[in-house]
UniProtKB/Swiss-Prot annotation:
It comes from the Bacteria. This is Orotate phosphoribosyltransferase. The gene is pyrE. Orotate binds at S126. Pathway: Pyrimidine metabolism; UMP biosynthesis via de novo pathway; UMP from orotate: step 1/2. Its EC number is 2.4.2.10. It comes from Streptococcus agalactiae serotype V (strain ATCC BAA-611 / 2603 V/R). 5-phospho-alpha-D-ribose 1-diphosphate binds at R96, K100, H102, E122, D123, L124, I125, S126, T127, G128, G129, S130.
Amino acid sequence: MDLARQIAMELLDIQAVYLRPQQPFTWASGVKSPIYTDNRVTLSYPETRTLIENGFVKQIQKHFPNVDIIAGTATAGIPHGAIIADKMNLPFAYIRSKAKDHGVGNQIEGRVYSGQKMVIIEDLISTGGSVLEAVTAAQSQGIEVLGVVAIFTYQLAKAEQAFREADIPLVTLTDYNQLIKVAKVNGYITADQLVLLKKFKEDQMNWQS
């Protein structure tokens, strides 16, 4: 089994991902979604965590071999990023969603330098907005962001467009298409539910109609 399928299976097994087309979740944006993802759960399962961190290292070495520093997004990317940096013997920093309003007002915590080549770690890509704000924060300090690596992406067109416009490569360990395929093969969803899940990916506002 390849890594993408293996991680998709793990996310389903440990209930980091819930698929509920008949009882949709409501996202913070108000969108009714047949899927809910909480990849923070992966940290509680050592075998799953090791699989994910080794997958991160493999993808970084493959796509971004010249990396100087690993950064995690606050808060979900921090634990994964710290483990990855340790495995790769690289410096680590994390990037807040906004600068602190006290102290020295840092948005990036850790020792970073202009000219460093950074890879940013995120756990989940939905629209891509928050991690691309982290990219901008790093770039504003003269850091070269080589790319973003995440556990999972919903593969929404809005996110793909945002990464293209930002000219930032995105690499994920697994994705929505892989997950729903694995879910169907392993009996987590029915054929009818698979149809709804495919419709959601294409049209988040009208998939239920």
